[in-house]
UniProtKB/Swiss-Prot annotation:
Binds 1 Mg(2+) ion per subunit. The magnesium is bound as Mg-PRPP. The keyword Metal-binding does not apply. 5-phospho-alpha-D-ribose 1-diphosphate binds at R79, R104, D131, P132, M133, L134, A135, T136, G137, G138, S139, D200. Its EC number is 2.4.2.9. This is Uracil phosphoribosyltransferase. GO terms for biological process: UMP salvage; uracil salvage. Its cofactor is Mg(2+). It comes from Lactiplantibacillus plantarum (strain ATCC BAA-793 / NCIMB 8826 / WCFS1). Catalyzes the conversion of uracil and 5-phospho-alpha-D-ribose 1-diphosphate (PRPP) to UMP and diphosphate. GO terms for molecular function: GTP binding; magnesium ion binding; uracil phosphoribosyltransferase activity.
């Protein structure tokens, strides 16, 4: 079973409170999501493997550590996931970026796929799938289905806010996936929104309604 972890670092929690506030404007919301994502990238990459290499400093030859193992790809779930990409690239600037596009049908609350563009070597990469919200879990489950169908196997999912219903649904459907969130909220309301949540992350990131 993959792990589930709430990243309760004080800076993450402080910045998350700022974006939860309904009067937080687009500029600040976008900046805070970027900063939270950078902090989350630091936390979720703790188990990336290292190997020894020989280098020469200005003083002497030395054995030091460098990243080993699979290369990295960041995969945002469009469109709101785009807001988390730059934060991850701040920490892992050489990562490739794929895209998975889907929208939520407002009547059924189920996701509908409309776009997939991934690195050609996706099966050989450690994937960090990012989406600010894990509500019903439908979009995340469909994204995992799409990625696994294309050969991906080493996947971590990151969100800012999750509902218990979404966490359960995702872990039931994909028990091998590690799931990280900055907050586990109370429940979903009748419209499928996380309570207390932070509203529609996509609209708040891009200034739309």
């Amino acid at each position: 079973m993959g792990k589930f972890e709430v990243l309760d670092h004080p800076l993450i929690q402080h910045k998350l409170t700022i974006i939860r506030e309904k009067n937080c404007g687009t500029k600040v919301f976008r900046e805070m999501v970027n900063e939270i994502s950078t902090l989350m990238a630091y936390e979720v990459s703790r188990d990336m493997p290292l190997k020894d290499i020989e280098i020469e400093t200005p003083i002497a030859k030395s054995t030091q550590k460098t990243l080993a193992g699979k290369k990295v790809a960041i995969v945002p779930i469009l469109r709101a996931g785009l807001g988390m990409v730059d934060g991850f690239l701040n920490m892992i600037p050489a990562a490739k970026v794929g895209h998975v596009g889907m929208y939520r049908d407002e009547k059924t609350l189920k996701p509908v796929e409309y776009f997939v563009k991934l690195p050609s070597d996706i099966s050989q990469r450690q994937l960090f799938v990012v989406d600010p919200m894990l509500a019903t879990g439908g979009s995340a489950i469909m994204a995992m289905d799409m990625l696994k169908k294309r050969g991906a196997s080493n996947i971590k999912f990151m969100c800012l806010v999750a509902a218990p219903e979404g966490v359960k649904a995702l872990r039931d459907a994909h028990p091998d996936i590690d799931v990280y969130t900055a907050a586990l909220d109370d429940h979903l309301n009748e419209d499928g929104y996380i309570v207390p949540g932070l509203g529609d992350a996509g609209d708040r990131l891009f200034g739309t309604k």
